[in-house]
Amino acid sequence: MAGYKTNRRTKNAGSSLEMSHFIDAGANKIKSKIRDIERLLKKKRDTLPDTVIIEKERTLDALKLELENAKVRQVIKKNAKKYHMVRFFERKKALRRYKQAVKDLEDKPENKKYIKNLEKSKIDLCYVVNFPKTEKYISLYPVNEEENSEHDADSNLEQTKLRREAFLKLVEQQYKENTLPVSLQKILQGKKLEKENTGVTLNKPNSKSEDAIVRHAHQEEEDEEDDFFE
């Protein structure tokens, strides 16, 4: 998800004067206005002029879209507060590892291990910066996996690991395609995700695309285990 939807410049945004009070408003205020309009249309649809009905319906559609935006903003705000420190320290750690990988490769440019380490450090750094604001942050360098599971009694540590790998694969893919919200070059210039950019995102849960990425990550993990025991 590059950013959440906006209705600020659509022709069907309803009355601009009426909507101006609800752009960037809280969810409760928007819900209250939605209920007011729905009650009005339900009770007086037969007596209201067609132009008023059309205007109210457009405003209603715009309000519902703005409500979704408000919900996204709430999640982003909550996650920003909760994961600010861990993301800050992981960004520093990833940047430090990247710089070390660059230095190592400069010393031994033909070393295959150093080449691989540099590529990995690039993806890790891009992961930390571009991880979606709307998701619970999955630590790239957890002391233990319980940090990511938040100590839930029924936490699925394997699923957490698979989702991390899925996001890493997605970041790697967008890095190669040069479609990351914040490119490696911009990250090295100190850039972060812009306010209305939510970062990379997998498709909706249980979608075929996400399932495919998770399955691919799981298969690679199994292949590595097979190689180890051979």
Curated annotation (Swiss-Prot):
CC per GO annotation? nucleolus; preribosome, small subunit precursor
> What superkingdom heads the lineage?
Eukaryota
Q: Where are the transmembrane segments?
A: none
Residues folding into a coiled coil are 27-75
Q: Where is the composition biased (Basic and acidic residues)?
A: 207-219
Biased composition regions of type Acidic residues, renumbered to the chain: 220-230
Keyword Nucleus listed? The answer is yes
Region of interest called Disordered, as start-end residue ranges on this chain: 195-230
Localization, UniProt: Nucleus, Nucleolus
Record carries keyword Coiled coil:
yes
Give me any GO biological process, just one.
nuclear RNA surveillance
The protein's name is rRNA-processing protein EFG1
Please state the gene responsible for encoding this protein: EFG1
